[in-house]
Structures are given as structure tokens and as C-alpha cells.
Amino acid sequence: MRIFTEQALSEYIQKHPETKTALQEWKYVVRHSEWTSFADIKKVFNSVDAVGNQRYVFNIMGNHHRIVVVIKFTIYFVYIRFIGTHTEYERMNKTIGAKNI
């Protein structure tokens, strides 16, 4: 998969250095995957949720951090829409809904 907006990961790691290993592992796995469906993602990331509108939520570091991405399976494209703490995600989810992030 191709990850668009990878810079967001680097910026987040600078703010939250404790996430470096987990986010590097996530990025490595995503880059080396060729997902064609949600079922393919679930095989690798059991805790991922499909929230609608082509958006998927990944739990990072035991659900302390979240990444929301748009995935275009036909072109192997992952676009990072949000990365933040669980609390930040919950606040945003209540305000606009995860499928609109």
C-alpha cells in the first residue's frame, strides 16, 4: 500500500516520542501490504474498525492512540486523515463522527 501524508506520522512521533516504535511498525506493515478488502486488513490488524465512508480506525499502543485513514483498495492507497490520542479521537468522533474525519 502507498501511504499518503506520511509526514503526519513523523510530526506525531515528535510530539509523542513513546509512539515511535508502534507507528514505525504500523507504517512498515501497511507499506508491505496489498489489501483488497476490509477482511484483508483484519487478518493483520485485528482491532481495526471500519467506520464508513471508506474510513478505518487503527488502535495504536493498546488503544492509547488512534489513526483514521481513508483506504482506496483498487489503487492500494492509504490517506491518513487523523492521528491523535484516544481522548482526542473520542472528542472528534462525538463532534463530527469518525466517518466524517
Model-predicted regions and their roles:
Residues 1-64, 73-79, 86-101:
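Basic, Lys/Arg-enriched alpha-helical interface segments
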